[in-house]
Amino acid sequence: MGAAPSKIVDGLLEDTNFDRDEIERLRKRFMKLDRDSSGSIDKNEFMSIPGVSSNPLAGRIMEVFDADNSGDVDFQEFITGLSIFSGRGSKDEKLRFAFKIYDIDKDGFISNGELFIVLKIMVGSNLDDEQLQQIVDRTIVENDSDGDGRLSFEEFKNAIETTEVAKSLTLQYDV
């Protein structure tokens, strides 16, 4: 993958928070990560990104970056995903990304089971399953304003609106 085709770059300029120079620098970084020169980053390559492998949600993050569900992250998906974490990414973009981490089946809702799975990944063995299920049940009950037993994006957003989630989803990196 030499210089990124201008049509792709033009689309990324329109759809992301990066300028042309930033996209070019990120393209070079992408090419270094793509060790086998396949044009995409597989799970092992994705996990080699500094700070990613130590994140318990790294697998889910990669799945959210992988918009076409191919199992790999191509250049457009890489830039689009990183754009959300840039300082220019909006709070709404960051919250939508966080929501997608929990929405494993991509149906637009966070179910009790999905919330349990993601929280289990995060807390590991620090809580037993019964304690964790109580937290999940309480979280759903307290935030499910329409009573359908699951959280929509708006319910999720309202639940964490007062937290500093958007700030914690901003990466400081040298582009």
Curated annotation (Swiss-Prot):
Residues lipid-modified (N-myristoyl glycine): G2
Keywords: Calcium, Lipoprotein, Metal-binding, Myristate, Repeat
Binding site for Ca(2+) 3: D103, D105, D107, E114
Binding site for Ca(2+) 1: D34, D36, S38, S40, E45
Record-level GO BP terms: calcineurin-mediated signaling; cellular response to pheromone; conjugation with cellular fusion; intracellular monoatomic ion homeostasis; positive regulation of DNA-templated transcription; regulation of cell morphogenesis
The protein's assembly and partners: Composed of a catalytic subunit (A) and a regulatory subunit (B).
Family classification: Belongs to the calcineurin regulatory subunit family.
PANTHER family, sorted: PROTEIN PHOSPATASE 3 REGULATORY SUBUNIT B ALPHA ISOFORM TYPE 1
Protein name: Calcineurin subunit B
Gene: CNB1
